[in-house]
């Protein structure tokens, strides 16, 4: 039986209506693919608590949870990932790539030019449809 993991991904939008995209490190599972930054929800955490904590840990900036955006489950070879993405905004600090290879800001209509991790694709498509 495959392990199930519940994770959060932050859809962080700036004042220019661009979305923060994170390139997974080659050392990570799904390396060299793009994702919305985030991570595992710890036991007892709400989605908003998890996303604020994960972004503080990964990008060293503070965000505000705005709203849940998409809930998607994707089955990989060894694990089932339930990814909940949420719209967020930065309240202090500047995101820096510590765990990722690179961070970029992209207009929503250009998101599909990147090669995304499979679990993130439904949220990317939903964002583009809403433009």
What annotation goes with each model-predicted range?
Residues 1-19, 40:
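Conserved N-terminal beta-strand and adjoining loop/helix that marks the start
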Residues 1-3, 128-131:
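Generic C-terminal helix-cap and adjacent flexible tail
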Residues 14, 62, 71-94, 104:
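Active-site-adjacent beta-strand/loop module that shapes the phosphate/pyrophosphate-binding cleft
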Residues 18-57:
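Conserved Nudix-box catalytic region and its N-terminal flanking loop in Nudix hydrolases
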Residues 58-64:
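Short secondary-structure junctions
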Residues 87, 96-127:
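NUDIX/MutT-family hydrolases
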């Amino acid at each position: 039986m495959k392990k199930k993991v519940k994770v959060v991904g932050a859809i962080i939008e700036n004042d220019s209506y661009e979305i923060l995209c994170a390139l997974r490190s080659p050392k990570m599972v799904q390396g060299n693919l793009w994702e919305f930054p985030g991570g595992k929800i710890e036991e007892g955490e709400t989605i908003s608590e998890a996303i604020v904590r994960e972004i503080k840990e990964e990008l060293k900036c503070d965000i505000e949870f705005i709203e849940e955006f998409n809930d998607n489950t994707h089955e990989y070879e060894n694990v089932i990932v339930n990814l909940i993405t949420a719209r967020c905004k930065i309240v202090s600090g500047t995101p820096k790539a510590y765990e990722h290879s690179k961070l970029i800001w992209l207009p929503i209509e250009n998101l599909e030019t990147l090669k995304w991790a499979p679990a993130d694709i439904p949220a990317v498509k939903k964002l583009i449809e809403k433009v």
